[in-house]
From Swiss-Prot:
Annotated residues for binding of (6S)-5,6,7,8-tetrahydrofolate: 121, 125-127, 245, 354-356
Keywords, sorted A to Z: Amino-acid biosynthesis, Cytoplasm, One-carbon metabolism, Pyridoxal phosphate, Transferase
Gene designation per UniProt: glyA
Primary location: cytoplasm
Domain of life where this protein originates: Bacteria
Record-linked CDD domains: SHMT (cd00378)
Listed GO CC annotations: cytosol
Natural source organism: Aliivibrio salmonicida (strain LFI1238)
EC number of the protein: 2.1.2.1
Site (Plays an important role in substrate specificity): 228
Annotated pathway: One-carbon metabolism; tetrahydrofolate interconversion; Amino-acid biosynthesis; glycine biosynthesis; glycine from L-serine: step 1/1
Residues bearing the modification N6-(pyridoxal phosphate)lysine: 229
InterPro entries found in the cross-reference section: PyrdxlP-dep_Trfase, PyrdxlP-dep_Trfase_major, PyrdxlP-dep_Trfase_small, Ser_HO-MeTrfase, Ser_HO-MeTrfase-like, Ser_HO-MeTrfase_PLP_BS, SHMT-like_dom
Protein name: Serine hydroxymethyltransferase
Length: 416
């Protein structure tokens, strides 16, 4: 018989120790990976609920199993809140991840071999936008577009490529681009060649929900996102659209039964909580601070003589180009990690090094802002990072910086 006082600590000491170690790491490290965030205890409560036991293939009111009347309520709450949050008529909250949401869009709108215009991974795109190692690059004819010498999306190139190649779908969105996307211009280009316009807003969904970054939903045929990152919910995916019932039916079928079986009802409950949190005024205030902190960090890096791809940031992330410093992204990642500052190595435009080494790092502000960093804190943090990068291999600098990191982490805990 199952008892509610069963716990991991008493039963599986090895697993419990690993979980505790990760808990300590999160509290004692500064998290700057742009795709990570801290979700609320309310979201974690939902994910640890008995909803995890329920199979619910299908959609609310149209399930293949009985006993779904209450999980129908949960999913309907998530759907309605997602639509309200982003101004959408349709939402599918079942994708297990952003990549699976993207896969569903491909399946719904395209046939294998169709031509797709997507942002080059080397210029800030995502694996699912056409990388040859991903399903998108293996199954479809991908034409990449990129950024110009000023670090802005080259819309003239995009339009010329669209006219030349006549893609069936054009993808907007990114994983490492720090500027504002002109969704209206992209839709104009798509309409000019009769293509679907699909936006993956995973990185900026929280900013969009708060109104501090342009919303693609009014412009795109279909929009996807993750529900973590800037949105700060559970790890999962979401599909949105305003383009009519025919498209909604295709998207639903592409998710289930096309790509997934039963939805993760405990995660959908977590999404419902996160969407409610994102509708609160405090969430907008948080997102405003996210952008302000990223800008404060960029200003300090520039003042210290570092190159920033695109020269600035208008969202939550930026890329530090280390080519002229003769430091690899891999080396910078490791050095900063030694001081309890977590970033990720990242390719920069025209990077001469492999994706496993790279010549840059990607820096994001959602997590530090979530734990209460001010603009002054963010500026100081960028300075500490420059200290380490200016003195690669100097253990005294690393140790001094680590002490500062531990002090601010103690002052600003993730979970107070």
């Amino acid at each position: 018989m199952l008892k509610r006082d069963m716990n991991i600590a008493d039963y599986d000491a090895d697993l419990f120790a690993a979980i505790q170690e990760e808990t300590v790491r999160q509290e004692e490290h500064i998290e700057l990976i742009a795709s990570e965030n801290y979700t609320s205890p309310r979201v974690m409560e939902a994910q640890g609920s008995q909803l995890t036991n329920k199979y619910a293939e299908g959609y609310p009111g149209k399930r293949y199993y009985g006993g779904c009347e209450f999980v129908d309520k949960v999913e309907t709450l998530a759907i309605n809140r997602a639509c309200e949050l982003f101004g959408a008529e349709y939402a599918n909250v079942q994708p297990h991840s952003g990549s699976q949401a993207n896969n569903a869009v491909y399946m719904a709108l395209l046939n294998a071999g169709d031509t797709v215009l997507g942002m080059s991974l080397a210029h800030g795109g995502h694996l699912t936008h056409g990388s040859p190692v991903n399903f998108s690059g293996k199954l479809y004819n991908i034409i990449p577009y990129g950024i110009d010498e000023a670090g802005q999306i080259d819309y003239e190139e995009m339009e010329a490529l669209a006219i030349e190649h006549k893609p069936k779908m054009i993808i907007g969105g990114f994983s490492a681009y720090s500027q504002i996307c002109d969704w209206a211009r992209m839709r104009e280009i798509a309409d000019k060649v009769g293509a679907y316009f699909f936006v993956d807003m995973a990185h900026v969904a929280g900013l969009i929900a708060a109104g501090v970054y342009p919303n693609p939903v009014p412009h795109a045929h279909v929009v996807t996102t993750t529900t973590h990152k800037t949105l700060a919910g559970p790890r999962g995916g979401l599909i949105l659209s305003n383009e009519g019932e025919d498209l909604y039916k295709k998207l639903n079928s592409a998710v289930f039964p096309g790509g997934q079986g039963g939805p993760l009802m405990h995660v959908i409950a977590g999404k419902a909580v996160a969407f409610k949190e994102a509708l609160e005024p405090e969430f907008k205030e948080y997102q405003v601070r996210v952008v302000a902190n990223a800008k404060a960090m960029v200003a300090e890096f520039l003042a210290r003589g570092y190159n920033i791809v695109s020269g600035s940031t208008e969202n939550h992330l930026f890329l530090v180009d280390l080519i002229d410093k003769d430091i690899t992204g891999k080396e910078a990642d490791a050095a900063l990690g030694s001081a309890n500052i977590t970033v990720n190595k990242n390719s920069v435009p025209n990077d001469p090094r492999s994706p496993f080494v790279t010549s840059g790092i990607r820096v994001g502000s959602p997590s530090i802002t979530r734990r209460g960093f001010s603009e002054e804190d963010a500026k100081n943090l960028a300075g500490w990072m420059c200290d380490i990068l200016d003195n690669m291999g100097d253990e005294s600098v690393i140790e001094a910086t680590k002490a500062k990191v531990l002090e601010i982490c103690k002052r600003l805990p993730v979970y107070a």
